[in-house]
Regions:
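Short, basic/aromatic recognition patches
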Residues: 118-143, 171-182
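Solvent-exposed, extracytoplasmic
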Residues: 169-199
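Juxtamembrane extracytoplasmic/periplasmic/luminal helical "stalk" adjacent to the first N-terminal
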Residues: 1-47, 147-148
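Short, glycine-anchored, charge-dense loop/turn motifs used at functional sites
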Residues: 80-82, 158, 189-199, 204
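Extracellular/periplasmic juxtamembrane segments that couple receptor/chemosensory ectodomains to their
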Residues: 205-239
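Soluble sensory domains of the PAS superfamily and closely related sensory modules
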Residues: 66-68, 118-133, 220-232
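Extracellular/periplasmic ligand-sensing ectodomains of membrane signal-transduction proteins
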Residues: 68-129, 200-202
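Conserved beta-strands of PAS-like sensory domains
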Residues: 144-178, 237-239
């Protein structure tokens, strides 16, 4: 395995710009939510789920603007922020082609099918670090049942993370954009993340989600290359 960070720009190109645009839209959603919560609290009342209705056109606009790449978007709340829901996910996704639907999962910690978003990387890292994060690829069992990459960032109020705003990209949408460029090159290539997990590959031997066995031996080099990459912390490798 050979690290090829120098060709990342050629492979991603306008795709990186599109993903940065999605990140910007998620940031806009986070700003709107932060302003909404601040306004409600300044009126000396606690926020409730009904207050979030005003965010739905913004979420729908994000989904429509990047429809072939973005499968879901919304906000996930820190426990106790909403007065009428100990935990809450205001998340909308393309279940069918007609219109976005609200995601419904069981948020009761005592339930056997409890969806524990607090432990999810896409929530936990932005909430604890105060910085944006890219998670994946992983199989999104809670929503799409497809390989996804989640872009997320914290919603901060007085320095505290009160929610996380995010968006799910489907890996198949990334493949449509990037694989044709990969296949034009002379050698098989893959994009891998800092953990050595394959995001995209032009080789049938390496599919999204697989851990490359050679990654462990050069993990520090992979992590350094991914840390320098933006907006996606991935690095191309050749076989």
């Amino acid at each position: 395995m050979i690290l090829l960070p120098e060709i990342c720009g050629d492979l991603l190109g306008d795709v990186a710009d599109e993903i940065e645009s999605v990140f910007s839209a998620v940031g806009g959603l986070a700003d709107e939510l932060g302003a909404l919560l601040a306004a409600v609290l300044s009126a000396r009342r606690e926020p409730v789920r009904e207050d979030l209705v005003v965010l739905r056109p913004l979420i729908a606009g994000l989904l429509q603007s990047h429809r072939s790449l973005v499968k879901g978007a919304g906000a996930i709340f820190t426990p106790g922020v909403l007065a009428d829901a100990p935990r809450w996910i205001e998340w909308w996704w393309w279940r069918t082609s007609s219109a976005p639907e609200a995601l419904r999962v069981n948020l009761d910690p005592e339930a056997p099918d409890h969806y524990d978003y607090l432990s999810a990387e896409w929530y936990r890292i932005p909430a604890s670090t105060g910085t944006r994060h890219v998670t994946g690829p992983y199989v999104d069992y809670a929503c799409t049942n497809e390989y996804a990459v989640t872009l997320s960032l914290p919603v901060l109020l007085d320095g505290r993370a009160v929610a996380v705003a995010g968006s799910d990209l489907i890996v198949s949408g990334l493949e449509e954009r990037v694989l044709p460029r990969m296949c034009k090159l002379a050698r098989p290539l893959a994009l891998i993340n800092a953990q050595g997990r394959v995001v995209l590959s032009s080789s049938p031997d390496w599919t999204p989600g697989m851990l490359h066995p050679s990654a462990q031996s050069v993990r520090s080099e992979i992590q350094a290359a991914c840390a320098c990459a933006s907006p996606l912390p991935w690095v191309p490798v050749g076989f």
